[in-house]
Amino acid sequence: MARFVAVALLVLLSLSGLETIQHAPKIQVYSRHPAENGKPNFLNCYVSGFHPSDIEVDLLKNGKKIEKVEHSDLSFSKDWSFYLLYYTEFTPNEKDEYACRVSHVTFSTPKTVKWDRNM
């Protein structure tokens, strides 16, 4: 029993140190299918490799927050960093600009990554 308590305490102590680790998120913005003007598609913002888990992600159209956005559950990798996918249906055209804005403790100000229709 004492051995179990010692091992459990060691595990808890090692995990408690994870909160002090900070990793900036990697942000990727892309469409599900190649962009075609006037053809419905999905805009994706994949945010990965970040720690701690507190994060705010917004998809933007012409600099304004898109309200109807869905996202995956918060998940973590083998290295205990987190990842998320935010997505929404959209219809690309030549005049509108789309982006993903991320706020995280590792950024002094929110970081915005624009969607490149040629990627």
From Swiss-Prot:
Domain of life: Eukaryota
Record domain Ig-like C1-type: where: 25-114
Endpoints of the signal sequence: 1-20
Biological process per Gene Ontology, one example term: immune response
Alphabetical UniProt keywords: Disulfide bond, Immunity, Immunoglobulin domain, MHC I, Secreted, Signal
InterPro entries the UniProt entry points to: B2Microglobulin, Ig-like_dom, Ig-like_dom_sf, Ig-like_fold, Ig/MHC_CS, Ig_C1-set, MHC/Immunoglobulin
Cellular compartments annotated: Secreted
GO annotations of cellular component type: extracellular region; MHC class I protein complex
Primary localization class, coarse: secreted
Disulfide bonds: 45-100
Keyword Secreted: yes
Assembly: Heterodimer of an alpha chain and a beta chain. Beta-2-microglobulin is the beta-chain of major histocompatibility complex class I molecules.
Function: Component of the class I major histocompatibility complex (MHC). Involved in the presentation of peptide antigens to the immune system.
Similarity comment text for this entry: Belongs to the beta-2-microglobulin family.
Name of the protein in its database record: Beta-2-microglobulin
